[in-house]
């Protein structure tokens, strides 16, 4: 449930049953959002620094330096960046700081030009979103007869040792100021 919700938050499409429009869908539809053209062939360890740099260079001067500015990146972008940090992408035989290899120790904080990179597993490959956290919203209805979570013990029904989970809920996302967001 958590992974499906994560995927829908970032990449959902209202036309798909059980989904709502995710940030990628709403940001693409907003003409005010700053769009950065993706590199042909996708992001990899050899070009990731330039691609994240293109995203950072497109951030509005009103937002750059904001306390809650973050760059949300897909799994392949984070993986490529971590690999590039160790020097392995440059083929110079680099082994990272103190020969410790790549730089993402125990899943700690990763930054680019001082801006936190946040792994967003729900983003599709080669996607990045630079935005203030306060400009991105997630909402759900909790006090309604349309909201329900149930665990059904199937032992009394069919004699099995199974449980079934029923979940019904509503959710959605929204952004406020499109011109303060960069979509790669």
Residues covered by each model-derived region:
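Sequence/fold signature of self-assembling virion shell proteins
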Residues: 17-50, 82-184
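Ordered core of a single globular domain
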Residues: 49-88
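Short, charged N-terminal helix-start/capping segments
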Residues: 1-3, 97
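Short, glycine/acidic-rich hinge or "gate" loops at secondary-structure transitions
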Residues: 3-19
């Amino acid at each position: 449930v958590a992974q499906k919700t994560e995927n829908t938050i970032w990449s959902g499409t209202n036309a798909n049953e059980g989904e709502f429009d995710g940030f990628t869908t709403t940001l693409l539809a907003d003409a005010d959002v700053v769009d950065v053209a993706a590199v042909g062939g996708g992001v990899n360890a050899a070009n990731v620094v330039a691609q994240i740099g293109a995203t950072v260079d497109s951030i509005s001067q009103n937002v750059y330096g904001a306390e809650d500015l973050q760059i949300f990146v897909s799994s392949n972008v984070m993986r490529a960046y971590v690999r590039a940090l160790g020097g392995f992408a440059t083929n110079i035989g680099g082994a990272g700081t103190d020969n410790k290899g790549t730089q993402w120790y125990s899943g700690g904080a990763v930054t680019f030009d001082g801006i936190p990179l946040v792994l967003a597993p729900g983003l599709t490959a080669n996607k990045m979103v630079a935005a203030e956290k306060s400009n991105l919203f997630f909402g759900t209805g909790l006090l309604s007869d349309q909201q329900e979570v149930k665990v059904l013990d199937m032992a009394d029904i069919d004699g099995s040792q199974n449980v079934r989970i029923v979940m019904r809920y509503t959710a959605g996302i929204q952004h406020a100021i499109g011109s303060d967001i960069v979509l790669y």
